[in-house]
């Protein structure tokens, strides 16, 4: 295993998180579904923390982005994702997510110069996700946004084999902690986006919406309400 200062810092934060919870290693191991030796080896950096391990940490209440790359959660009101959730059946929510995404992208692209670099980054990623028919591979979209056509280029950048990279890109394997740290350093998207912890498209819509002007936000909200004009927000929840 290649040890870097960034990975060592992650292991240290893992230890701090455990101690803040007032857990010894045995109790923490139980909380994240490991044996005590398995947990001890991961915290000490003797074994790589896998993507599955990180999902267990997330399920236990850990802030994965803070733990991995020392980044606080981006302030967000989650307006769009909350509205989408009121549409009931998953097929309907996916339809709403798609048309709202198209509408927001259309509005943003006309005013792209008004947004911060971070918001532009989210807009470009959302546009790429919308182009991807499966809408479930962050790494495909990362390659698209950065104009990388050859998997070998990004696998070399990450220091992993093309075979391993291909498995991760095609959702046959979750990226481990070291890969996630490198992805963040290279492209700036937080690790949790690669671990299927939430719907990335909905999260991007929330971030972008918060950056829009109040007038444009009102236009978006009116658009959403007109998608089901016969029902109020509260009534949609009950359907």
Segments from the language model and where they lie:
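DNA major-groove recognition helix of helix-turn-helix/homeodomain DNA-binding modules
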Residues: 50-68, 176-193
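A short, Lys/Arg-rich alpha-helix, primarily the initiator
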Residues: 1-20, 93-147
């Amino acid at each position: 295993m290649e040890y870097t200062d960034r990975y060592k810092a992650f292991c240290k934060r893992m230890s701090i998180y455990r101690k803040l919870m007032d857990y010894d290693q045995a109790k923490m191991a139980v909380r994240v579904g490991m044996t005590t030796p398995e947990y001890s080896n991961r915290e000490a950096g003797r074994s790589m923390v896998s993507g599955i391990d990180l999902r267990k940490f997330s399920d236990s209440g850990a802030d994965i982005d803070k733990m991995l790359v020392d980044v606080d959660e981006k302030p967000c009101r989650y307006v769009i994702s909350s509205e989408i959730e009121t549409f009931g059946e998953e097929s309907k929510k996916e339809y709403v997510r798609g048309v709202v995404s198209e509408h927001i992208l259309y509005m943003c692209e006309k005013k792209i110069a008004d947004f911060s670099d971070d918001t532009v980054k989210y807009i470009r990623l959302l546009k790429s996700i919308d182009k991807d028919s499966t809408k479930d591979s962050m790494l495909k979209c990362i390659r698209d946004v950065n104009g990388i056509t050859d998997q070998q280029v990004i696998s070399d950048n990450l220091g992993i084999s093309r075979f391993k990279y291909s498995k991760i890109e095609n959702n046959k394997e979750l990226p481990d902690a070291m890969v996630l740290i490198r992805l963040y350093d290279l492209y700036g998207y937080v690790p949790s986006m690669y671990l299927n912890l939430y719907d990335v498209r909905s999260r991007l819509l929330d971030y972008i919406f918060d950056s829009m002007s109040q007038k444009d936000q009102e236009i978006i909200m009116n658009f959403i309400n007109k998608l089901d004009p016969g029902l109020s927000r509260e009534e949609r929840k009950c359907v």
